[in-house]
Amino acid sequence: MKNPFLNSKMKPFILASLSILSIGTLAFYNQKSQLINALRADFLNEGTGDVNDLEVYPGLEISTFATEPMLKNPTNIEVDAQGRIWVLEAYNYRPAINGNPTNAEGDRILILEDTDKDGKADKQTVFYQSKDLNAPLGIAVLDNVVIVSQSPYIWKMYDDNRDGKADRKEILFQGIGGEQHDHGAHAFVFGPDGKLYFNMGNEGKQLLDAKGNPVLDQDGNAINQKNYRQGMVFRCNLDGSHVEVLGHNFRNNYEVAVDSYGGLWQSDNDDDGNKGVRINAVFEHGNYGYVDEKTGEGWYINRTNIEKEVHLRHWHLNDPGVMPNLLQTGSGSPTGMVVYEGNLLPEVFLSLIHI
């Protein structure tokens, strides 16, 4: 069918406009790449990055353990029982949007070590690299088993001969939405009860098992958006069995933190620009209000007893049954949290949640 809005007189104009748009886009990405390269050169020349500009608590100091070219665009780290630092890279994240180059061999999982004990990494081992590793977001290391979160998969990788190289991998879960998206599956955490805890943002949507079957929750219901809303928090056995949904209706809850009593804590990022970033204590079966639990409507829709301030309205805090926020921190996008219960840092940091 001929397009009535496209006549012969308009075609040259449209082609010229598309050409200008293409040239302008290319010029933008070229300028962006030049700027990034210049900043990277300054970063590498100084060898410390921007750590000298960070404000540090009196009596503490911060230093650079590793930087480029040893690692590139890390998204998550883990410290194993030997004190080695495991680094998950997402160098190939969204190249069609950001215009950055990609690594044709795929993203990497690195092991970094400080063999001479000078506080800087001097040994790098590539544990795994493959085209199927595509902008992963989470890593957990349990002895010689590595759990990698990368929508649509959760993988278990095994170092059978303990040489620092992955020997095999298998699917733990699959079918998770959010591939090449930061609202997908996030890192696993080992809890004091011997179970695994993990979460996903609101692009994750569902869990399937290794065979592609729906994973059922503690009540026998399929874990999907028909039975739950938006982002979710989970607990399961080490083999992925007996999955429990502990809370739901988050936007992009990033890496749940588990304390020594089994308490769960996490941050949740708001729709950008609404100063609604929040910290939550996660209680089992909790509805955390990102959308209307019954209708699925967003926070901006008019409703009974609507909150006056946007940052409160954002989480349906006046809706019956919605769990209150522990704290709202304003703007930003937290991407990590830990509950510190050790004694190496000054006492002021004991039993605090660090974001």
Regions found by a protein language model. Name each.
Residues 27-353:
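Beta-propeller domains with acidic blade repeats across secreted/periplasmic ectodomains
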Residues 1, 353-355:
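Accessible peptide chain termini
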